[in-house]
Amino acid sequence: MNESKFTNWGLTVKTALLRRGKTQSWLEEEITRRTGLYMDAGYIYKILTGRRNAPKIVTAINEILEIKTQAHHKTNRIS
């Protein structure tokens, strides 16, 4: 079974959502509202697991969730 793994940054994002009582769908809507870019669950999942590099989206997520200087690295996955 091929199990996808979140990057450290992706795990930080998921944890920040849980702490705020917000869903990934809420985050997708906020990203779209702030950037004007369409966001869906599949694309955000690829970003959180390091399969996609989207600097504008990462910046928006960091701002929305108030994540401080947490780097987004494709190779930094959680087992």
What are these regions (language model features)?
Residues 34-53:
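Recognition helix of helix-turn-helix/homeodomain-like DNA-binding domains
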Residues 25-36:
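DNA-recognition alpha helix
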Residues 1-22:
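A short, Lys/Arg-rich alpha-helix, primarily the initiator
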Residues 11-12, 43, 60:
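Pre-recognition alpha-helix immediately N-terminal to the DNA-recognition helix
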Residues 52-72:
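DNA major-groove recognition helix of helix-turn-helix/homeodomain DNA-binding modules
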Residues 71-79:
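Short amphipathic recognition helices of helix-turn-helix/homeodomain-type DNA-binding modules
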Residues 16, 30, 47:
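Residues in the recognition helix of alpha-helical DNA-binding motifs
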